[in-house]
Amino acid sequence: MEQYHGTTIVSVRRGNQVALGGDGQVTLGNIVMKGTARKVRTIYDGKVLVGFAGATADAFSLLDRFEAKLQKYQGHLLRAAVDLAKDWRTDRALRHLEAMLIVADRESTLVITGNGDVLDPEGGIAAIGSGGAYAQSAAKALMENTELAPRDVVEKSLRIAGELCIYTNTNFVIETLE
């Protein structure tokens, strides 16, 4: 059976602000199943932003596990991410989950993959999903050539990705922390 997939998630950090946004499209094969999905949210009493790309059910499972790890480590983002990545890589059931997460708090942004990677992106920009490369390129250009706030960079980057990637639409959810 085909998986639901296709999305763009992008995060931008500048100064003491971070923004994380995603589009709303859920695709099954070559059919758009939903255009208003919410793949970005705040957790841990509004102190952590999280966005996910990949198979929807897998992403929700990982999101729940990440939130539990945050509780376990009292909001310490890196420790929670590393513990989740270890479980994801070593647990036989979790190993087959097909999703990626971007998580961010006031201090850091991390990309968590199913390969056990916890990546601290360079330049304050992270992007995942089918339109991730488009959004990341756009965000990099905007960060280097404008003084736009992170939220505006995220929105413009998602718009560009939505114009180029068939698995990305222009119904955005953007969350920020200051």
Swiss-Prot record:
Activity-regulation annotation: Allosterically activated by HslU binding.
Tagged with keyword Phosphoprotein: no
Gene Ontology BP terms: proteolysis involved in protein catabolic process
Catalytic activity: ATP-dependent cleavage of peptide bonds with broad specificity
Keywords: Allosteric enzyme, Cytoplasm, Hydrolase, Metal-binding, Protease, Sodium, Threonine protease
InterPro entries given in the database record: ATP-dep_Prtase_HsIV_su, Ntn_hydrolases_N, Proteasome_sua/b, Proteasome_suB-type
Chief site of localization: cytoplasm
Compartment(s): Cytoplasm
Binding site for Na(+): G162, C165, T168
Highest rank taxon of the organism: Bacteria
Molecular-function GO term, any one: metal ion binding
Cytoplasm found in the keyword field: yes
Assigned EC number: 3.4.25.2
Cystine pairings recorded for this chain: none
Signal peptide (UniProt feature, chain positions): none
A GO cellular-component term linked to this record: HslUV protease complex
Stored Gene3D superfamilies: Glutamine Phosphoribosylpyrophosphate, subunit 1, domain 1
Family: Belongs to the peptidase T1B family. HslV subfamily.
Main function: Protease subunit of a proteasome-like degradation complex believed to be a general protein degrading machinery.
Assembly: A double ring-shaped homohexamer of HslV is capped on each side by a ring-shaped HslU homohexamer. The assembly of the HslU/HslV complex is dependent on binding of ATP.
Name recorded for this polypeptide: ATP-dependent protease subunit HslV
